Regions:
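Short beta-strand segments
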Residues: 46-51, 133-136, 159-160
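Loop/turn elements at helix/coil->beta-strand transitions in domains of secreted/extracellular proteins
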Residues: 42-47, 129-130, 154-156
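Secretory-pathway/luminal and periplasmic proteins that interact with or process carbohydrate-rich
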Residues: 55-59, 124-130
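Acidic/polar loop patches that form or flank catalytic/metal-binding clefts of enzymes
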Residues: 83-89, 106-116, 128-133, 159, ...
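Short, surface-exposed beta-strand/loop micro-motifs that present aromatic residues
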Residues: 146-152, 159, 196-199
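Active-site-proximal cap/lid insertion segments
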Residues: 1-98, 102-112, 167, 172-206, ...
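Bilobed periplasmic-binding protein-like "clamshell/Venus-flytrap" ligand-binding domains
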Residues: 235-252
Length: 308
């Protein structure tokens, strides 16, 4: 059992169901690769497999924790990628996919494109500058705005949660799962689970984890005096990246110790989210109306020609 989940029979059963879906995905990929081989184009095809971010469980899905973004990225390209090799040294991100695909077909990468080509790494080469990644989260599929930013190095993970004020609750599809519901039940009698549930629901403005010693992100080191230098360095890198990417959350980050500034930022964020929801709902309602009118419209009957 992953330590960030509750070890409980109900949770174990749901986790087993997830592992079953992973096996079915593996079966499907096998069928695709077999069809590719049968086509005769396998040696001339770059195959890329990238997982969605995180299992659909609490503390993983719709989060920026270590296991939320530690996903498989697999390449198959005969003659370029050596078989049965694993690169666990370079830290890469999804923004590197587009530059990689452009580079692989000989297209010059346009200026302003974020990310770097992974082609040298795929060839087994070693490069500098792959020692950190930045992460972003904005809102869930329902348009509930809970923006987060994070930077992860090979040793530490720093997370900034501007939405967290001790009252606002985070909503996620994981809350409809049996695992979450079981956590709620167990939290009534277990203080440790209750504490974890509170963190999941309300979070805190800043989090810091030693992902080498604590990859499950169970101990927040944000107030630990032993890690203040590392925290300062990570905050500096975060601010630099946010400036470079023109992140609208930069002012909130610089004012992270001021609840009023964070509240103003979230007011703007929620207003934008509300406008997007209204826009999406208007499109949805328009399509529903059009489909209804199409169904209700009388069917046109063409006249049958008759003999004079």
């Amino acid at each position: 059992m992953p330590p960030y989940l509750v070890d409980d029979p109900i949770v174990r059963q749901e986790l087993a169901h997830y592992y079953s879906t992973v096996r079915r995905a593996d079966d499907a990929v096998g069928e695709i690769l077999a069809a590719l081989q049968a086509s005769g184009e396998a040696d001339n095809t770059l195959v890329m497999f990238l997982s969605d971010h995180g299992m659909p469980f609490p503390f993983v899905k719709t989060q920026l924790y270590h296991h939320s973004t530690l996903t498989p990225l697999i390449f198959r390209w005969p003659g370029i990628v050596q078989e049965n090799t694993v690169d666990d040294v370079h830290m890469v991100s999804a923004i590197d996919i587009l530059p990689t695909l452009l580079d692989s077909v000989g297209v010059q990468i346009p200026k302003g494109i974020q990310g770097r080509s992974l082609l040298p790494l795929m060839r087994g080469e070693s490069q500098d500058g792959w020692d950190r990644i930045f992460k972003e989260y904005a809102e869930n599929s329902s348009g509930e705005r809970t923006p987060m930013r994070a930077i992860e190095t090979k040793r530490f993970l720093y997370i900034f949660n501007p939405w967290s004020n001790g009252k606002r609750r985070m909503t996620s599809a994981t809350m409809h799962m049996n695992t979450y519901k079981r956590m709620v039940e167990l939290a009534e009698k277990d203080e440790k689970i209750a504490s974890r549930l509170e963190l999941l629901t309300y979070r805190v403005v800043e989090e810091l984890y030693d992902v080498q010693a604590d990859p499950d992100c169970l101990v927040n080191l944000i107030a630990d005096p032993k890690y203040q230098k590392e925290l300062t360095d990570l905050r500096f890198l975060m601010a630099t990246w946010m400036r470079e990417t023109q992140d609208p959350a930069l002012n909130a980050f610089n004012s992270r110790a001021e609840p009023k500034a964070l509240a103003e930022f979230m007011t703007t964020q929620n207003l934008g989210a509300q406008r997007r929801r209204e826009w999406k709902h208007a499109i949805r309602d328009s399509l529903r109306k059009a489909n209804t009118e199409k169904v209700d419209a009388p069917e046109r009957v063409e006249p049958v020609p008759t003999q004079p």
